[in-house]
Amino acid sequence: MIEHAEKLTQTSATPPTLTTLSGDVIGALINLSGRRRFTSQRVVLYAVLASMGHDGAIATARETLGMLRDAHVTLVEGKGVFPGVFCEQLREAYFGTLQGDKAIRIFIRHAESTLDAISDNTHGAPGLLEELLRISTPLLSILNGLTLMYEEQSKRHAQAQRKELQTMMAEIKVVSKQARVAALSAQIVAARAGLEGKQFAAEASNMTSITGQMDELVHKALHGALAH
């Protein structure tokens, strides 16, 4: 039964800030969270099929359970480019009031016990399967909530990136204006220098043209950033 499932120690990590994560990584985190939701229900389905004697159901259930476990460990503990729990909202969901990490790990442990019992055809298998079915419903609600949290973090990340781009473009525009003023001043100085300053004046004119093009590009980029 669920009360006899092994309690696993919660895991925490020192997370990076949201803005240091790429959009691709956050998108992959959303996919992993969605995979947990799908695989949890698939495990239950194939456990039921296995209890009815369907060929290959046990193997499929165990393979799916492995996918669920791997996805959860990656999301909570981190792996490769994946940061683990990277913000306070997720930390609260996993280890705070919701106790998402505990619920998911208990489900995984109970599913393992259920599949072993079904495979060995023990007398306790029906009761374990019944309990697995019972805990799968509240677990689905938890997994849905966690996936929504990752989607919300994705929106916040996009907003932060947009703000950063706007700030950068504004700074470039300021520098471009300063360069254009300097180029115009150089043209004036060159004109006063007479014939000797003609070449310098030509270069200054080119610089003015380039900074003008920069202004136009920055304007287009900034307009595009504000439009999204």
Predicted regions and their residues:
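Amphipathic alpha-helical segments and their boundaries
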Residues: K7-R35
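Juxtamembrane amphipathic/coiled-coil helical coupling segments that flank
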Residues: S12-P15, T19, I135-Q161
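A conserved signal-transducing helical linker
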Residues: T20-G23, G27, R156-A170, H228
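N-terminal extracytoplasmic segments of bacterial inner-membrane proteins
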Residues: D24-D55, V181
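Secondary-structure edge/capping motif, primarily at the C-terminal ends of alpha-helices
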Residues: S40-H54, L75, K79-F82, H110-A125, ...
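Heptad-repeat alpha-helical coiled-coil/4-helix-bundle sensor or tether segments in soluble regions
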Residues: L65-H123
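Parallel, heptad-repeat alpha-helical coiled-coil signal-transduction segments
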Residues: A191-A227
